[in-house]
Amino acid sequence: MQTAQRRRFLLQSAALTVVGAGLPASWAAGKIKPGERAALIVVDVQNCFVPGGTLPVAKGDEVVPVINRIAAAFENVVVTQDWHTQGHASFASTHAGKKPFETTQLSYGQQVLWPDHCVQGTDDAALHKDLQVPKAQVILRKGFHQHVDSYSAFEEADRKTSTGLAGYLKQRGIKTVFVTGLATDFCVAWTALDAKRLGFETYVVEDATRAIDLNGSLDAAWKNMKAKGVKRIQSSDIEVA
């Protein structure tokens, strides 16, 4: 190989190395192919969070067909379910004089107060009827402790009480997680941030989520996730056989 040709070849090779440095080994031709060490986390796709529910996320039902499609690409799937007691501490109705979407101070810090939602055993708390994730091995219920809310699938809002999900995933050899569901700026974001902090390579599939967007919370969530190294992708970035 002539000197000029060799120089061009080395420069091109170096450029490819730099471009690919931040991508997983399974990323080829612009697509991610989840392997046996990847897990899909489906967050709170429940009747309470879709139109007609007690805490509806705008267009929340639109995530269902997206999740159903990409779920086929995963051998490991975890589904979470918000599962509150009657009179839960996160409900505005529990606090005299408080209205939904106001805040209050609880023992673990500031808490957004919500309408009563996802109460254990009700149809409102059930998973969406059209959600089809046949490979799901675990349904993780969260938010069932009376005095503590739980946005994250990994840890409750007191930042002390683990749900056990991290240990479960690590025991199965999972290295990478893809987070989907409701709502982007609360339970999805908290789950993604905790996953990254706990050592998992973490992706949020944007078009498989929808947001509440309370006082700019969506923009803040994306900025925070980006700053912490959570990757933002679309469902079209995932290779589905």
What are these regions (language model features)?
Residues 1-17:
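N-terminal secretory signal peptides and thylakoid transit peptides that target proteins
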Residues 85-89, 148-149, 187-188:
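Short catalytic/ligand-binding loop motif for oxyanion handling, primarily in non-cytosolic enzymes
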